[in-house]
Amino acid sequence: SLYTYLLTAFVLLLHRNARQQEYIVGMPIAARLTKEQEHMIAPLVNVLPLRLPLDEAASFSELVQTIRGILFAAFRHQRLEFTDIVRAVNVDRSAGHFPIYQCMFQLDNMPLASPTLNGVN
């Protein structure tokens, strides 16, 4: 999907600057998991940390396939609350940054409304 390709490109951009072998990127997902929540007017969002390895010897296509598998696994666990993940990992907390990831990747796929101006098409 477009998201997978763009996330792969984002990780490569991170790698260009940081030169790490692994990145943890936050992925916001809609947390409307029940019928009752679908009609609520509220931002129901959960953030899943994605542990994304980067193999410098891999081709772009191979990286896309690796990240695709990680995304499918993340969606299977989307009911996990972020606070539960933080407790399970037991990382040191700091007011200066999020406990598990320091960057997020989000793709808005909502169609944009075209502005309407008098006399302009």
PLM segments and residue spans:
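Adenylate-forming
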Residues: S1-N121
